[in-house]
Amino acid sequence: MSECPVRKSNVGGGGTRNHDWWPAQLRLNILRQHTPVSNPLDKDFDYAAAFKSLDYEGLKKDLTKLMTDSQDWWPADFGHYGGLFIRMAWHSAGTYRVTDGRGGGGEGQQRFAPLNSWPDNVSLDKARRLLWPIKQKYGNKISWSDLLLLTGNVALESMGFKTFGFAGGRPDTWEADESVYWGAETTWLGNEDRYSEGQEGHEGHGVVQGDESKKQHTDIHNRDLQSPLASSHMGLIYVNPEGPDGIPDPVASAKDIRVTFGRMAMNDEETVALIAGGHSFGKTHGAGPTHHVGKEPEAAPIEHQGLGWANSFGQGKGPDTITSGLEVTWTPTPTKWGMGYLEYLYKFDWEPTKSPAGANQWVAKNAEPTIPDAYDPNKKKLPTMLTTDIALRMDPAYDKICRDYLANPDKFADAFARAWFKLLHRDMGPRTRWIGPEVPSEILPWEDYIPPVDYQIIDDNDIAALKKEILATGVAPKKLIFVAWSSASSFRGSDKRGGANGARIRLAPQNEWKVNDPSTLREVLAALESVQQKFNDSSSGKKVSLADLIVLGGVAALEQASGLVVPFTPGRNDATQEHTDVHSFTHLEPHADGFRSYGKGTKRVRTEQFLIDRASLLTLSAPELTALIGGLRVLEANYDGSSYGVLTKTPGKLTNDYFVNLLDTNTAWKAADNEGEVFIGYDRKTHDKKWTATRADLIFGAHAELRALAEVYAAVDGEEKFKRDFVAAWHKVMNLDRFDLKQEGRGQNAPKL
C-alpha cells in the first residue's frame, strides 16, 4: 500500500499516531461511536414519529417516476434505473452477517467508507446521487437507511413484481461504523487472510485473474471462510461472480454461495430465490478493460464531490460503463418481472467465455441473439450468465429448487418476495421497530417474535410485593443478578436481537449455553416461575411475565446489595419456543464474555478484545463498561461462581472495592498459567496470595485510558458516583431491547437502539 498522506500532515490529526507505534494496543474507539455529538439532529428528534408523518404514497410515486427519468450525466440501462436501484438496496442490506449481527442496511452505512468505495459497489455512488433530489424533498421524514431500501422495493414494483411489504424505522448514523470486521486483507479483492490458500488482491480497480489463481490453488472445493465474514473477497458483498478466486468453476462456486448466503441467515431456498429473482432484472457492466476506471470515491479528487470510479473508456457511461468487468444481461426482459432467468438457465447449454474486460463468464451454446442491448434498440446479444448462475444448475440441491421454481412460477414469486423482505429487514430487530403502512401482518419465522402484552401489567405496589416474594425464595442474590444479567446481556445492538424481553434464556438454545451456567439458571427459573404462578393465579386480570420477573429478580438483589433504588419498567412478555429459531440463536452465544469471567482469548483475539467487542454490541461507552465490570465482580456475578476478579472482602455488597484493590500498588500480579489468561495478585511485602483475576480485569489497570476511568471510581470520593453509574448502566442494559419505550436522553433517532 502507498504511504499514508495523513502521517505527513503537520496539523491536528496528522502525524504518527499511537496505533502506528503500538499496533497491538487495545482500542476503545468503537465504544465512542454514534454519540449525540456526531448527530446533527435535535436531541428530541423522534424519527419514528417523523416517518409516520411522511407522505409515503407521494414518496413512492416520486421514486416510481425516477425509475424511467433517465439523466444524461448517468443514463439508465434500457431506459429504466430499476436494476441499478435493486443492486443498491441489495448491496446495502446484503452486508449483514448473522454471526455477529453487524453490517446490513439498518444504519445507511453504504454512504460511508469503506462500503462507499468497495469494488463491488462501483456506480452505486451514482445511484445515491440520483436519489438526492428526492431525499432533499422529504428531508428528515425519511432516513437514508430507509430510502436506500425502499427504493429497491419500488424498483421491483415498477417492473411488475409484487413485493411482500416494507417496514420503515431505520434511523441514520453519521459516521463510518468502525466496529465491523471486514477482513484483514490490505488490497481490494484479496482473500489471503480469510482463506488459508487465498490470494492477494490488487491496487486500484480490476478483476481477479482466475487463470493465475488456478495455477496457484490446490483445492477451491474445500476451504473454510474465516468467521464472522460472509464474503469471499475483501470488497465484495458475497462471492466472486466469476467463480472462486476468479476461477470459473460452478461446483466450487456453489459451495462458496452456500457459505456466504448461509452466514447472511439465508437457507438454500431463499438463496436461490434471491439470486434468480434479483438476476431477473438489469445487467452487469464490463464494456472495456478495467484500467480505464479511476479512483474510488474516498480516493477521488475533491472536485468530484464524492463520486468515484471516473471512466475514461468511450463516454465513460451508458454503453461504455465498467463496474465489475462482467458484461451480462440475464433475460430478454430486463425491466420486467418474469420467468426469463430460470427459463434461459435451463434452455441452453453454457460454455465459458470472456467479457470485454477479460472477466470469466458464460455464453449460451448454439443460441440466437435474443438479449436486448441496453442502449441500441436495433441490436441483440447472445444470452450470457455468470459462474454463480451456472452454479445453481450444477449444484444438486440448488438445481432441484430451481426446477421446482421453474415449474411453479407463483411459488417462485412468493419465495423471492419473502426472501427479499427478509434481506431488507433481517437486521431491524423486533416488530415493535417496524413502522409504515406496508408492514405485513404475517408473523415470520426469523423475526424473533414476542407476543404483544394483552393483559394488565403490574403496578408499583405489585412490584414492591414481588421483590419481597423473590427474595423470600431463598435463592442467593448473586444468582438472581447473574441470571438477570445473562438474560439482558444477550442483546446485540448490531441487529437488535437478544435481550431480556421474551425470556428466551429459558428456551433452547440459551438454556443450555455453558456461559449461562445451566444448573444455576434452572434453580433461579424454578423459583421465579413459582412466584409468577402464585401472582398470576391470585390476581384478577393482572399478570407478570417471566421476562419481567427475571429482570425484577436482579433489581431486587441489586437494591439489597447497594442500598439504592434501582429503576424497573415492566411490560415485557414471554416468547415461545415455536417463535425461537434455535439455529439462528446459536450465533448469539459468546465465545468469551469478560462481564461474567467466561472463556478466554484465541490466537487471533485477546480476551480483552472480546470484552470490548461485547461492550460494543451492548452499545456501552467506556465509562459504562468500567462501572459494570467493577460492580458485577463485587456482586459475584461470575460464570460458575468463580472468584476471578472478586477483589473485595465483602462480596455481595456494591462497593468500589474492585477498583481500590485493582489499583493498589502494594499488589504485584503474576501469570498463573502459560497462556497469560489467569493472574494471581500477591502482597509485595509478605508475598501472600491476595486475589485471582483474568485479563478482563487486569486490563483496567494496564490500559492507560481504562485505568484513568478506574481511578475515578477508586478515589475516596468515587464510591457513591460508582454506585450511581453502575445502577444507571445496569438499567440501560436491562432495557436495551425495550423498543416500546422511548430511551431517555437519546431520542428515538439514536442509532444504537
UniProtKB/Swiss-Prot annotation:
Entry cofactors: heme b
Listed SUPFAM superfamilies: Heme-dependent peroxidases
Principal EC category: oxidoreductase
Pfam families found in the cross-reference section: peroxidase (PF00141)
Marked site: Transition state stabilizer: R87
Crosslink (Tryptophyl-tyrosyl-methioninium (Tyr-Met) (with W-90)) position: Y238-M264
Cross-link Tryptophyl-tyrosyl-methioninium (Trp-Tyr) (with M-264): where in chain: W90-Y238
Cofactor binding, per record: Binds 1 heme b (iron(II)-protoporphyrin IX) group per monomer.
Binding site for heme b: H279
Function: Bifunctional enzyme with both catalase and broad-spectrum peroxidase activity.
Quaternary structure and interacting proteins, as annotated: Homodimer or homotetramer.
The family this protein is said to belong to: Belongs to the peroxidase family. Peroxidase/catalase subfamily.
Designated name of the protein: Catalase-peroxidase
